[in-house]
Amino acid sequence: FPFKWRRLSFLLNHIGLFVALIAATLGNADMQRLKMTTRMGSAEWRATDDKGQLIELPLAIELKDFTIDEYPPKLMLIDNETGRTLPEKSPEHVLLEEGVIKGTLQDWQLTIEQSIPMAASVATEDTLKFTEFHSMGATYAVYLKAVNQKNQTTKEGWVSCGSFLFPYKAIRLDSLTSLVMPEREPQRFASEVKIYTQEGTITEGTIEVNRPMEIEGWKIYQLSYDETKGRWSDVSVFELVRDPWLPFVYAGIIMMMAGAVCLFVSAQKRKEEDKA
């Protein structure tokens, strides 16, 4: 009886390894990796390969909505001549989380007097100010006062990271440094899609980075978006991957796992026989 278990584990391990290796090798040759660019409100069934050739697919993706969760904006100092953040080796920043009204950057004490998460810039006769703007292209803006702790120099004004619709706004603190708000960094971005197949099925779902959708042998990954528009992007780029040999790779791995279980059972039986 123990001999049968050992024999079975040997066969499962070696056959499983053989199947997994052969399938992985063939899959590497037959794998399709395509890139598809979709636009809000329209279905797309064409994608390009790594050579730029256009390929028609047996499925179509319609982008219903695109959302981005962003990290809170930051305030930083830059060198007026080089544009580099300061200090150069270890740049400092003030993170404008909810409720933050004060911060320090090197010798400058900052006091936030007004924050507008959805803002638009408005040009006046002698300056640029920001007002609430709850529509596409809105940007983040703060009105602040900066006081130099060494010489008591005071500067105040609007600072904004800007958007594809409105320019960024910085404050020139002195001849050497300026206070800026870099572009906000994406924390999470996702696409709500509707997928159509030739068989007539319609599947709705959400695709995120590292959370692909799988349909008819295709894995659909969130790749990128229109970074010039940021959170207002109406374009989403997907990577579609198809490996026809992947089920065989999994089958080989399962066989090896089963072989390991058989080996464990065989060892347990042998211990029981030795005790007897």
Q: Which residue ranges define each predicted feature?
A:
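Solvent-exposed, non-transmembrane regions of integral membrane proteins
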Residues: 1-276
